[in-house]
Regions:
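Cleavable N-terminal signal peptides of Sec/SRP-targeted secreted and luminal proteins
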Residues: 2-18
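Carbohydrate-active catalytic/glycan-binding domains of CAZyme proteins
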Residues: 20-398
């Protein structure tokens, strides 16, 4: 009995010591270390002993962009005419009560299983708040365009739309699936003065040169402009954690950082894709990613651990990758229900505009269990600050 008591005390001490912080890195740079108490004080939107997990609030069913089960049309070859796969929310600069979502759909009802070559970019709108529901507004690209990321460049006074893919004018007679070996993803950018277009022709900025060690896919852009430094420089993060910068959105993109860890796929616990990169209010850098850990450890299972968080004081590193979950595929809803999705990928955040860079919403492409083509875009609020944001816009309960 005495031995058991001593062991319990030691385990408690060791656990408490393990949770202590010494530097802000111990708080994932998502908060500050209160050294007097050796505990982390997390920024809004983040929770956990090390502030490494998103504080996700319940989502509302049938918000986001969720039209995957609408009936197919006469020109569709399959049954998923409005399946979508993730996207990014942009608040209208002229009418703050209007929100835009840039996402992808799949032509001819081919759904997610036919993403290459059937994926194309659309713009959807919500007039009922940032959570949606969003409704189709217009088509932005031809096939094949996928994985869009859109940012506003204050220096250029333009919207910059990055995506992967190539324009393809083939007349389809059936749903197809084309491998990477035939169609490299590549990364291109288009620009517009207005979020409703017109959009300039896509210009390729990075090609998928695997022999050179670059897999150009999954773009995530961040303009470096600030009021103190009104630069036109752009940061572009891509899969396998390669980070590029360009002096302007039209300039040459030069490699500034490559992951120091093993980025090979399949058996690697650090395997990620779909980075979403940003700079916080302290000037530190972060990304959330689709983490493939269960695929590696559980015989290609795609759930429930799906999100990772990486951070660094400088863009050029060192970047810290804690092998722990930042979010899962288990989603709780406002009706009291919950659901574990088979896939939850393409994470992107919508931040507060007050300079605090508080994450208010996360978007993902999600797919239910036992599905292959049906998918939709989920919007989930984060923390509690989103309530004030919506209230100031006149949305939500009084």
């Amino acid at each position: 009995m005495r031995y058991l008591l001593i062991l319990t005390v030691w385990v408690t001490i060791l656990f408490a010591f393990a949770q202590c912080c010494i530097t802000d890195e111990d708080c994932s740079l998502n908060g500050i270390c209160i050294k007097r108490h050796q505990t982390c004080q997390c920024d809004a939107g983040w929770i956990g002993n090390d502030c490494g997990r998103l504080d996700l609030a319940p989502a509302t069913r049938y918000t986001g962009y969720n039209h995957t089960y609408e009936p197919p049309g006469p020109n569709d070859f399959n049954i998923w005419p409005n399946a979508s796969w993730g996207g990014r929310i942009i608040q209208d600069r002229n009418d703050k009560r209007v929100f835009h979502l840039f996402t992808v759909q799949f032509s001819h009802g081919c759904g997610l299983k036919g993403w290459r070559p059937h994926s194309y970019i659309i713009r959807a709108e919500s007039h009922t708040g940032p959570q949606g529901p969003y409704h189709y507004a217009d088509t932005v690209s031809k096939n094949f365009a996928h994985n869009p990321d859109i940012v506003y460049s204050p220096a250029d006074k333009k919207y910059l739309l990055y995506s992967i893919g190539v324009e393809y004018d083939k007349l389809f007679t059936k749903c197809e699936s084309i491998s990477y070996t035939r169609w490299p993803n590549n990364i291109s950018v288009s620009a517009a003065d207005d979020i409703r277009g017109p959009w300039s022709p896509f210009k390729m900025v990075l090609d998928s040169d695997r022999p050179a060690g670059i897999h150009a896919t999954n773009p995530s852009a961040f303009p470096l402009w600030t009021r103190r430094n009104p630069t036109r420089e752009i940061v572009l993060g891509i899969k396998d954690y390669s980070i590029f910068t360009a002096k302007t959105w039209k300039s040459k993109y030069e490699l500034k950082y490559q992951a120091t860890w093993n980025v090979t796929e399949q058996q690697n616990p650090e395997w990620t894709e779909d980075p979403f990169i940003w700079r916080d209010k302290r000037g530190h850098w972060h990304s959330i990613n689709h983490w493939m850990i269960d695929y590696v450890e559980n015989d290609k299972q795609q759930w429930p651990r799906v999100g990772s968080h990486l951070f660094s004081r400088k863009l050029t590193g060192p970047w810290h990758f804690k092998l722990q979950e930042a979010f899962s595929s288990n989603v709780t809803f406002t009706d009291g229900s919950w659901q574990v999705f088979k896939r939850r990928e393409r994470p992107k955040l919508f931040f507060s505009g007050d300079g605090e860079m508080t994450p208010l919403y996360m978007t993902n492409g999600v797919q239910e269990m036992n599905q292959t083509g049906a998918s939709f875009t989920l919007v989930q609020p984060i923390g509690t600050k989103w309530k004030d944001f919506e209230k100031t816009l006149g949305f939500g309960a009084p």
